[in-house]
A protein has these predicted regions:
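Conserved strand-helix element at the start of the C-terminal RecA-like helicase core
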Residues: 57-69, 86, 280, 440-462
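N-terminal cationic and glycine-rich segments that engage phosphates or anionic surfaces
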Residues: 34, 87-432, 436-442, 461, ...
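Pre-Walker A (Motif I) flank of P-loop NTPase domains
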Residues: 27-34, 56-57, 133-135, 445-446
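Conserved helicase ATPase core of P-loop NTP-dependent helicases/translocases
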Residues: 478-500
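Conserved helicase motor "Helicase C" RecA-like lobe of SF1/SF2 P-loop NTPases
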Residues: 151, 453-475, 671, 675
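Conserved RecA-like helicase motor-core motifs
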Residues: 80-89, 303, 446-448, 460-482
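Walker A/P-loop
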Residues: 28-50
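Conserved pre-motif I regulatory segment
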Residues: 1-36
Length: 679
């Protein structure tokens, strides 16, 4: 089945030529191409068109979960009739195993797995194993981490047909080998139940239950039923049941692995004794022997992934299997924000190796633990068949890979131009900045200010607050969810200014921002490199009045490159707009869209679990509260009284054990206190 792209939009501006050039390159067999797309030019839509034209299974790689989720939703919208999957880390919380020699502290692995993401990961692998060609997997760097091999997974697939003669007990053993668990009481995901001649299987990779009925030794019916009502959804003549876990093995492989582990244990104990360290020898002996007993009795143990090399039958140092091994040979990779994603892929191996070095050196793990790892960059690179690097600021590596050939996408469908860049002396920069902020504030526009240090960000914010400017700051010490909330508050108008150290976040979408001010722009370094300056300047490219001010006493090479490149793009965009009679249009974006749809998710939970609304905590609308004219017009004493009354209501709710209501009062207090600071 081919990809079927569904969209109400048609390619415009630079999109048609970008789609054509990239598609032609893929058809020619070009190994690497670069799409240089400016902020807001519709790179995702271009990527979708290229994927549809290529007609190849595609991996879309993003550098973090949040942007991967955005891409996943967009791709699902573009390809509703095709297999669009999501493959990211399934840990809600993860504390890796570690040993700190300086304090003789051993830290056990601790984790919490997100069942929904686990299901999506299994669905991605199942779609690839099915042989479908119309598969798009949107992934984070999790795709380079170890998992079970494709051959073992393929051998664990259970193929059944209506009318097939198959002993029910033989089938049940196959289910167990595919890591499904029998549970006749609570049919959870990855479990099966047996009642007479009927077997119900809660599929590990979907929301449905598969019901198989026998007549004697013959399969009589294969049906998909609703997991809640058990009502029949559809019937099948044949069906493929995929494993319930990404790590499958056979009894023979397990037996062989135990023998090899015991052999390596003997060698490691001998090594520690030879260097005169009996404590480490005793430690590794006790730990591994305990793990072996657990594997023999239960089939698994804590930290079993550290023995994955033995179960996979790999040699020492051989790379682990990963998601890329499940793609056919002729597949496409699209690396989004490649200037960030490529270095991130390169860094994964080193960090993992450094942590495990102490575990092996001090007798907590066998050396085989080193082989449970992410791919080295060279190994990842070898698995690439064809790749498109996508970035507004491609790095030297990507340009070198594409042999200097770059497909540019500079025209925005909205007609918006790259912002003007103004360089001003750093003397009296704060006073000048304050004047600019007041000008924007009077036009109901927002301002981003970047500093070099956290302390500077905090002090500048304090200065602005003292001058009656509604400001806040974000940096690495501010919690992630708080950062998102602060940015949302900026959009709705609680703040006019947001100060930060590194506001060049790829994907940061704030169309209300008309001014980006860069302090100390001439201080060369990571935060003031050509790419960082270009990314930061791009935050003003979504506003029709977008402008960038660089405060500097000299023009560095990085500044010169950014200014010249922005001017070049701006002239091309101006010319295009004049030739086509386009007037730049301000982007109007739903305020709620910057945040995850917590309220919608909660309402779905209400419907799914049949809870009452009072049982679900819905985040209060920050914008609605901030825009309340009564709150805005309150005097300082009135705000103080309101805070005091709300505190009493919060305490009363807590006494009644109504913690959800108490949390809502708490959030109201926080916002009232912020309003009080502005008085």
């Amino acid at each position: 089945m081919d990809f079927k792209l569904t969209s109400k939009y048609k390619p415009t501006g630079d999109q048609p030529q970008a789609i054509r050039q990239l598609s032609d390159g893929i058809e020619r067999g070009d190994t690497a191409q670069v799409l240089l797309g400016v902020t807001g030019s519709g790179k995702t839509f271009t990527m979708a068109n290229v994927i549809a034209n290529a007609r190849k299974p595609t991996l879309v790689l993003s550098h973090n979960k949040t942007l991967a989720a955005q891409l996943f939703e967009e791709m699902k919208g573009f390809f509703p009739d095709n297999a669009v999957d999501y493959y990211v880390s399934y840990y809600d919380y993860y504390q890796p195993e570690a040993y700190l020699p300086s304090s003789d502290t051993y830290i056990e692995k601790d984790l919490a797995i997100n069942e929904e993401i686990d299901k999506l990961r299994l669905a991605a692998v199942s779609d690839l194993l099915s042989g479908r060609k119309d598969v798009i997997v949107v992934s984070s760097v999790s795709c380079i981490y170890g998992m079970g091999g494709p051959v073992a997974m393929q051998e664990s697939i259970i193929h059944i047909k209506r009318g097939q003669r198959l002993d029910r007990n033989v089938f049940l053993r196959k289910l167990v080998n595919a890591l499904y668990v029998r549970n006749d009481i609570d049919l959870q995901r990855g479990c099966f139940s047996v009642k007479g001649d009927t077997v119900n299987i809660a599929m590990a990779y979907s929301d449905y239950v598969l019901r198989i009925s026998w007549w004697d030794d013959e399969i009589d019916s294969i049906e998909e039923v609703d997991s809640l009502t058990m009502r029949r959804m559809q019937s099948f003549e044949e069906y493929a049941i995929y494993p319930a876990n990404l790590f499958v093995t056979t009894a023979e492989q397990t037996e062989r692995a135990i023998y090899q582990i015991q052999d390596d244990l003997t060698k490691q104990v001998a090594f520690f004794e030879e260097i005169g360290d009996p404590i480490k020898a005793q430690r590794i002996k006790e730990r591994v022997e305990y793990d072996m007993e657990m594997i023999k009795e239960l089939g698994h143990c804590a930290g079993i992934e550290n023995y994955s090399r033995y179960f996979d039958g790999r040699e020492a140092g051989q790379r682990p299997y990963c998601l890329l091994d499940f793609f056919p040979e002729d597949y496409l990779i699209v690396i989004d924000e490649s200037h960030v994603s490529v270095p991130q892929i390169s860094a994964m191996y080193g960090g993992d190796r450094a942590r495990k070095q102490n575990l092996v050196e001090y007798g907590f793990r066998l050396p085989a633990a080193f082989d449970n790892r992410p791919l080295r960059f060279e190994e990842f690179h070898e698995l690439i068949h064809q790749v498109v690097y996508v970035s507004a600021t491609p790095a030297d590596f990507e340009l070198q890979e594409a042999e200097g050939v770059v497909v540019e996408q500079l025209i925005r469908p909205t007609g918006l131009l790259d912002p003007e860049i103004d360089v001003r002396p750093s003397e009296n920069q704060i006073d000048d900045l304050l004047d600019e902020i007041l000008t924007r504030s009077n036009r109901n526009e927002r301002v981003l200010v970047t500093t070099l240090t956290k302390r500077m960000a905090e002090e500048l914010t304090e200065f602005l607050l003292n001058h009656n400017v509604r400001a806040n700051y974000i940096h690495s010490d501010v919690k992630t969810l708080d950062r998102v909330k602060i940015m949302n508050d900026l959009r709705v108008g609680i703040y006019d200014v947001l100060v930060g150290v590194n506001l060049l976040r790829e994907g940061l979408d704030l169309p209300e921002v008309s001014l980006v001010a860069i302090l100390d722009a001439d201080k060369e370094g990571f935060l003031r490199s050509h790419r960082s300056l270009t990314q930061t300047a791009g935050r003003a490219a979504r506003n029709v009045n977008g402008k960038v001010i660089m405060y500097a006493d000299s023009i560095t090479e990085s500044m010169r490159k950014t200014i010249e490149e922005t001017a070049r793009r701006r002239s091309i965009q101006l010319k295009y707009n004049e030739e086509h009679g386009i007037t730049p249009q301000q982007i109007v974006k739903d305020i709620k869209s910057i945040l995850p749809t917590e309220k919608e998710d909660a309402m779905q939970t209400v419907g799914t679990n049949r809870q009452t609304a009072a049982q679900v905590y819905l985040e209060p609308e920050a914008g609605a509260f901030a825009a309340d004219p009564i709150v805005l017009q309150m005097t300082r004493p009135e705000l103080e009284r309101s805070i005091e009354n709300t505190k009493k209501m919060m305490e009363e709710a807590a006494r009644k054990l109504d913690f959800i209501q108490a949390a809502q009062y708490r959030d109201e207090i926080v916002r009232l206190e912020k309003q009080l600071e502005l008085k």
